[in-house]
Amino acid sequence: MTIQKFLAMKGKEKIVMVTAYDTPTAKIAEEAGVDIILIGDSIGNNVLGYDSTIPVTMEEIIIHLKAVRRGAPNSFIVADMPFLSYGHSIEEAVKNAGILIKNGANAVKIEGGKFHCNLIEKCINIGIPVMGHLGFTPQSINIFGGYKVQGKKEDSKKTILESAIALEQCGVFSIVLEMVTEELAKEITEKISIPTIGIGAGRYCDGQVLVFHDIVGLNPNFKPKFSKQYANTYSIMLNALKEFKKDVKEKNFPKERHTFKGGK
């Protein structure tokens, strides 16, 4: 998969993106044939036990990026730029983006609007593809005051639309639209020539992304409205561990077939 192929898919074939955080989930994603694997800073909420994405560090992204690349050697991988890996200085941000590329990413994702255009242009000029991210941007959760749908009011709608146009002009190859009204997502998708990938952004984006753990049901207490659970893996894993515990306690495991014998 290449950026040129993604661009050609706009308006013709829906783009499928999922998160993956380790080698096993990456292997599953690649075998399923998804178009893009995202090493999201959502690793903070879903794997590392943080309350938000804000504590996630470059070092943590890199460790999991390497694991995902080993599990999905043939996939197009986008890595999130975590909080404070950009925004302080363009030079530092470009260096961090380059580190992610060197460690296996095909592109990086940067949250925020036209404020970051100088950074995005700098990255692209030295060969680092960039995916944008507008609407609800999790790294700004303290400003938003929680998980809130964006683009309901005219001023918010205008800002997001203008930012989408600006991001296209400065060279991003696609834009994630998160938790924005369906009407706004449709308008943006129709007004820009690059693909939009929605998460809680309705039916009219050029593609969709969901968190792996939400898809397979590994987060029993977190079921956002915009997501869909396709399996209840949490229950399957829980029951397996309970069965293992029961077998050990009742001396039903291991059996003779699980043991090794001495001899020549």
Swiss-Prot record:
GO cellular component, one term: cytoplasm
EC number(s) on file: 2.1.2.11
BP term (GO), one: pantothenate biosynthetic process
Coiled coil: none
Pathway: Cofactor biosynthesis; (R)-pantothenate biosynthesis; (R)-pantoate from 3-methyl-2-oxobutanoate: step 1/2
Binding-site positions, 3-methyl-2-oxobutanoate: 41-42, 80, 109
Cofactor, free-text remark: Binds 1 Mg(2+) ion per subunit.
Top-level EC class: transferase
Entry annotation: catalytic residues: 178 (proton acceptor)
Cofactor (UniProt): Mg(2+)
Residues noted as binding Mg(2+) in the record, renumbered to the chain: 41, 80, 111
Keywords: Cytoplasm, Magnesium, Metal-binding, Pantothenate biosynthesis, Transferase
Gene Ontology molecular functions: 3-methyl-2-oxobutanoate hydroxymethyltransferase activity; magnesium ion binding
Localization per Swiss-Prot or TrEMBL: Cytoplasm
CDD domains xref list: KPHMT-like
Reaction(s) catalysed by this chain's protein: 3-methyl-2-oxobutanoate + (6R)-5,10-methylene-5,6,7,8-tetrahydrofolate + H2O = 2-dehydropantoate + (6S)-5,6,7,8-tetrahydrofolate
PANTHER family in the cross-refs: 3-METHYL-2-OXOBUTANOATE HYDROXYMETHYLTRANSFERASE
Task of the protein: Catalyzes the reversible reaction in which hydroxymethyl group from 5,10-methylenetetrahydrofolate is transferred onto alpha-ketoisovalerate to form ketopantoate.
HAMAP family: PanB (MF_00156)
Family under the similarity heading: Belongs to the PanB family.
Record note on quaternary structure: Homodecamer; pentamer of dimers.
Name of the molecule in the record: 3-methyl-2-oxobutanoate hydroxymethyltransferase
Organism: Thermosipho melanesiensis (strain DSM 12029 / CIP 104789 / BI429)
Encoding gene (name): panB
